[in-house]
Amino acid sequence: MRSLSPRSVLPGLAVLLVLGAGAAAHANKPVPFGDRVDEPGVADASPVSAQSLATGNLELRVGPGLEAYDQATGEHLWSYRREGATALHLAMAGESAVVVWDDGMITSVRPSDHAVRWHRAVPGLADWLRADGEPGADTRTDTERRDTELERAAAALQPVTEPEPWVAVVTPALTMAFRDRDGDLRFNARPLADCSYDPLRTVHSDNAVLVPRSCTGGNSAGRPLPGLITGFRLDAPNWLLNAGPNVLLHRLDGHRAAVDDGPVIGTRTFDTVQGALEPVCGSPAVPFEAVKPEGTCSKP
């Protein structure tokens, strides 16, 4: 049997040292984004808001992380937390629970095994949630600040199910869309200069997100820029709809939204599959329209 010389032993030792160092580094690697899953009773699970969602045999609640309870017994099963961050709002995107955190992070969690699927940071989201520097911010109570955060978090996160689950995250300066199955950024959009998106007036259908904008500037002729609604979709070009600066949107069903543009123009119905307004019932244009009126509607 050939004996090993000191020189021949060195490469093997080097490999072992490298593997050992790698294992030690992996063992001491910080948990990404402060993630941790706690068993019942490990940490306080007092709710941040009254929001709850049911999925499978679980009831999911917000605060201070994503809290899971047994629907039948009410037993607290697990908590998903992030160090230094508080969960504000959750929505289901397919089988995933998508959470908005107060530090501007968006997280997708699979409730069935509390696996964290992806994290995405949205620029400017945390600042908008806090409303720092806005009129009246210095005089708000802690309760008012938290209520503002909760309202804005709910408006920012817009879940969509078609053609596959995805979410849009809307802030005044930016709209981003993430595909849920892998967290892939599908698009991002910014409004024109001197304009801003309005998350609080934004609505979603099953296949699109409708985002109004408002503008403070004017065009080259000095006239104020009009309001506008942008329709964002995952699998098709976006569309634009002219509207007044104070237009209000209301979801009617999975593929239609009401566009309330004030007493002069009135309320119209928008089809988010066709990307077009439904014609008014009784209008001469009805036979030639691609989008037909659905149900009953008022005569012109």
Predicted regions and their residues:
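Secretory-pathway ectodomains
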Residues: 1-300
